[in-house]
Amino acid sequence: MNYKITSDSTCDLSCEQAERYSIGILPLYVQLGDRTYQDGVDIFPDDIYQHITAGGALATTAAVNLSDYVRAFSALSRKYDFVIHICISQEFSCCYQNACLAAAEYENVYVVDSRNLSTGHGLVVLEAVRCAEEGMEPSRIVEHLQECTAHVDASFILSRLDYMQKGGRCSSVAVLGANLLKLRPAIEVKDGRMGVCKKYRGTFEACVKAYIKDRLQGKTQLDLRRVFITHSGVPDEIIETAKAAVLSYQNFEEICVTRAGCTVSSHCGPGTIGVLFLYER
């Protein structure tokens, strides 16, 4: 069957991955100053960082709107036998709600809530591609993806909290304490929501090593086909440290290093890195 897999830009897959697997990307919106941009189209995380460093206000993000989904689904539904669109968790955005409303007009368009964000979302997108390539019926793919969302392990560790403070997600007292004690919080996604899972103390490099050890050491029943190391802008040596740590605990076939897009980066700021992978069903 002729098919198309699409996703919100929050999947944080690289341009190369999207091109390789013919994944259609629908961008979220980013409000920066008095202008509105499209994530990954005419604005990128470093643009946001430069704006804020220059004294500008924190960027805000908005969902893919209903008309964008209708326009995309209308064109794709005529061209392909079926279309499957995977959204960022509905706990983080109204993308899923908007996509469902748009898809209701087309019998061959299906929408799945990834229950995740960033490459936790991206892992579900790539699983959709795999299923479609194997010739699964669309209804079975949707069912499989809904089961798959519970098997995504998505987490990040932050080196700084100033963006979280500016966004009202932590207090200035908490930021001061974290800076004084060199605390680096790790955040994980559970049931479609984010929460702090552990706080690490020390240099960021040491904390990254400890964080990856906690996520991977001694873990069984992992899907070893692929792991993502996704970051919002960290030094190359931190990425190399993360790659070495991952391989010291698990023998993944592929390590994908990707940059987080504007949605994640505008909330956490630079200096965030995570490992994201699947458990076997």
Describe each model-derived feature in a short phrase.
Residues 4, 10-24, 28-29, 35, ...:
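Mixed-charge interfacial surface used for oligomerization/domain docking
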Residues 1, 59-60, 86, 161, ...:
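Short, contiguous strand/loop micro-motifs
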Residues 36-105:
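Class I S-adenosyl-L-methionine
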Residues 63, 114-115:
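Short beta->alpha junction loops
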